[in-house]
Amino acid sequence: MLTLSSFFFPKNSSNKCWHENKITGLSFNSKKIAQNEIFIAVKGQNTDGIAYTKEAINNGAAAIICDKRSIIPNDVLQFLETKNIPLFKVKNPEITAAKTAKIFYPKQPEFIFAITGTNGKTTILDLTEQLLNLMGYKETATLGTMGFQTRNTKFNKLKNKINGIIGINPLTTQDTITLHKILDMSYYSGVKYLITEASSDGIMRHRIDEIDFVSCGLSNISEDHLITHGTMKHYSNTKFSLFSRLPPNKTVVYNNDDKYAKKLSDYLHKKLPEKSFNIIKYGKNSSANEIQIHQIKSNKYGYDIEIKIFDKNYKTRLNLTGEFQIYNAMHALGFVLSIIPKNKIQLAVDMLKKLKTVDGRMELIKTKNGADVFIDYAHNPSALEKALIELRKITKGRIISVTGISSGKSESRNETAKIAGKYADVVIFTYISPRFETADAIIAKQQKIFPGGLHGGKTRYAAIKKAIKMAKKGDSILINGQGHERFIVEYGKPKPFYDPDAVKDIISKE
């Protein structure tokens, strides 16, 4: 068992009686902290965790870590002294938390990949796992918006345990204590390859610090999360800073057709030249790409493509909908190329044709009358725009968009209404998670932006039903915003709801 002296804390403190105190864990939560755990008090937007010090100690905290800028009330200082609980003031508790978590949970899977970007993260991590599995690398798992997932049945017990810890509506990137605990658990359960999502908030709050990544990637950057970041410069630089966590001589994978690709290249060469990264760029618009997309021939449900990898040409097929899915697949291929020998490149290319659509990502369900229903997460304007543009290419009839926003989202998210109105022939407004707002209130916001949108009804189910009933042969319906999510939050409580189940139920009753 670890003691306080096992960590980086100075041993020459005047108060030496606590050096050998047993430590059983770490916690950010004063209510859930267990006996002999370290309480890490983090400053939030509205409160400082130091305010919960007494509660943490009463629940068993053996030590407190706080921000050195925190103002500690006299009664808290007296309480610490009375209980003989050490207090450590540090420059950044979240950085300290990551360092401490790495000591407490030291083991990690051998190959850890991290993907960041505005759109495509969940699809890329799933496609990467699929590709590894198809090539015979079976000890795989993913961690992100969809929780902890794996195609290996021997990890089902681990999957259930981890998802029990992180809950039904997990953060894209878990807090650093939970994340390191998951990595440690995964290692001891036999996971060798783990692909994880890195959100901008998770990067900014040092949740992904102290992780031994083998490859990190950037899919794309478009306007999002400006309530958190303020400006696109801050948002993009936060995304770029993921690569500062990547050890030297490891691999960077990125979309060279994205408008932020040049800025990322400059960042890598100017800010991190000493790291000597291996670079794998993919795209259509530069002959300097390590994965060059030469030719794309599309049909309704996929693409025949020609690509050049490290100066050698290959042909393959992708049975995925949407040209942006080609980019997602190329990113997955880039991750795989970062760890396989060159004599397995042909196998990797051959397996691309076996990749399947990710749940809730342009997932196709056919109606009885010949209309196509596509379910896509597309929870921000840029993702919705890409999905609708791709549907226009393959749709002979009308595009019917069932679109909405979550309660309390920023004005940029409200732009989804404008995007839907621009690209769809029929727009039916609904909600994603109404939280404490009514459907009428949320729909009214959208109709102010695009008055031509139809009211979808009191429930998301009703909006989907309206779309399916009006659809004819050759039409495409896009249902956006929920994707893989199996719950809607209403009045603070999660309510089971899954778009594919709703669609199938409605079709079965036609």
Predicted regions mapped to residue ranges:
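N-terminal leader/targeting and accessory segments in enzymes
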Residues: 1-99, 103, 153, 259, ...
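ATP-dependent carboxylate-amine ligase
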Residues: 1-14, 22, 35-38, 44, ...
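Phosphate-binding loop of NTP-binding sites
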Residues: 10, 95-256, 260-276, 334-340, ...
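Alpha-helical segments flanking ligand/cofactor-binding loops in enzyme cores
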Residues: 31, 54-55, 184, 233, ...
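Receiver (REC) domain switch/active-site residues of two-component response regulators
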Residues: 62, 214, 425
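Short, polar loop motifs at secondary-structure junctions
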Residues: 66-74, 144-147, 256-259, 284-286, ...
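Short secondary-structure boundary segments
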Residues: 66-69, 198, 220, 431, ...
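Adenine nucleotide phosphate-binding catalytic loops in nucleotide-utilizing enzymes
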Residues: 229-236, 240, 250, 254, ...
